[in-house]
């Protein structure tokens, strides 16, 4: 049901309920109608819309729920505004109200799609509000792995979903460029620069083993220049003994590499925030001092502890260790203070499920500052791990990364790159990258974040209905082909289809497809509210299924103009909604396959 129709029907039902309540209790009786909840019945034969308001109000109004439902239905159908919307009403069971919409109400979605085009499904109800989404936020110590890829897909699609509701969305990447890992990166690069490799005597125990370290060392020695998108160019000094220079070059090199990974994945960020800046600007010290002054800390065993149990944590947590260094959640608290100070009253973090333990600590620290930050700030979407399968075997290693599969590997493999090509990316064409990006983005968003995901490379390469992204894209391409043939054979352009006689669309398959199209706006609203980007992928698979059912049941290219143009109009509307949904996922909508 279209949102406008839903709002109208909710208002009509609320008015009908009020009429019945006053008839039962008296016109002067105080009564406020409850929020009307409309749902689609699980069984199509029960109607198009179901409502349980009679069950809710029977006891307060002192009447039988079924009799109450009958009175509500009588009041509803008597209202002139309901005539073009409600075709029939039935009472089921103890008092459920089942409504059937008129054919015109169901067909109205086609006109709405034609009128709104790319904007169909979007809303401006949240215009003027802003949301910060932080995701990926990898250490600049290696290429992005498949876990980062899942974060990138979840974060980018969720950002698109939230933006569809009118929010101004700010995408942010937090670089953990301070700490032990960065030191390990520097000594790894230094060892490679000295000619050592993993397994050699003298190879540092904490060093990273991926081939990318050798690439960094080579470019450092060759005095190459690298730069991240938001950073100053850094030129390799070539000095093997200058560990600080090696560190700066290695971080810049890997940030640039991660930029390239994200570009291949179709993800753009509005801002990159460096953890190191929290220290250089004194924000970590300032945050700790504020918590001490607020009485939220105490000293024990030479360490500074935060009273996180005051905010529901299972035990207090160390903030500053006895050696004077901070535990990892302390800069996170300082970082989130900056988010609040920048005016972001709604913040969503996409992180791996292994970060679950930090949530209570960060929130406790923010509450302890007493600066007006609400409880439950920030929101979190936690995701589980990704397992990569190829040729029926789990893939655990990558030549590029050494100990894990990278996002770039996944894109190239899913695009059909031949084994060995990933070592020579110049051999991989843009079409391969596009196919791979489409598959990876769709696959990684096609399960709920809190479920583990098995990424099957072989499935991603299949060109049949088993492959979900192919299934959806093929539906779009098939419609494009039909509409091209419509123009070629009958000289009917899509621009002429809004004038089609939609009363021709009466088959069960046509009605079901129209109903699925009408669900798109509410699906986006629900996905934004519940932080559930997977809902878009679920919807598109269902929509493609409804299209295929319709297309297999009814011929579109027939000589009879009225049914032909009506069916073509339905296909054109379906194509538009497929395009809109795929755009939210950041997946292409090919006209040919």
Curated annotation (Swiss-Prot):
It holds the Pfam family tRNA-synt_1d. Coiled coil: none annotated. A motif ('HIGH' region) lies at residues 138-148. InterPro entries: aa-tRNA-synth_I_CS (IPR001412), Arg-tRNA-ligase (IPR001278), Arg-tRNA-synth_N (IPR005148), Arg-tRNA-synth_N_sf (IPR036695), ArgRS_core (IPR035684), DALR_anticod-bd (IPR008909), Rossmann-like_a/b/a_fold (IPR014729), tRNAsynth_Ia_anticodon-bd (IPR009080). Its main location: cytoplasm. One of its GO terms (molecular function) is arginine-tRNA ligase activity. GO terms for biological process: arginyl-tRNA aminoacylation. It comes from the Bacteria. One of its GO terms (cellular component) is cytoplasm. Transmembrane segments: none annotated. It is found in: Cytoplasm. Keywords: Aminoacyl-tRNA synthetase, ATP-binding, Cytoplasm, Ligase, Nucleotide-binding, Protein biosynthesis. It catalyses: tRNA(Arg) + L-arginine + ATP = L-arginyl-tRNA(Arg) + AMP + diphosphate. PANTHER family: ARGININE--TRNA LIGASE, CYTOPLASMIC, ARGINYL-TRNA SYNTHETASE. Monomer. Belongs to the class-I aminoacyl-tRNA synthetase family. This is Arginine--tRNA ligase. It comes from Burkholderia ambifaria (strain ATCC BAA-244 / DSM 16087 / CCUG 44356 / LMG 19182 / AMMD) (Burkholderia cepacia (strain AMMD)). The lineage of its organism: Bacteria, Pseudomonadati, Pseudomonadota, Betaproteobacteria, Burkholderiales.
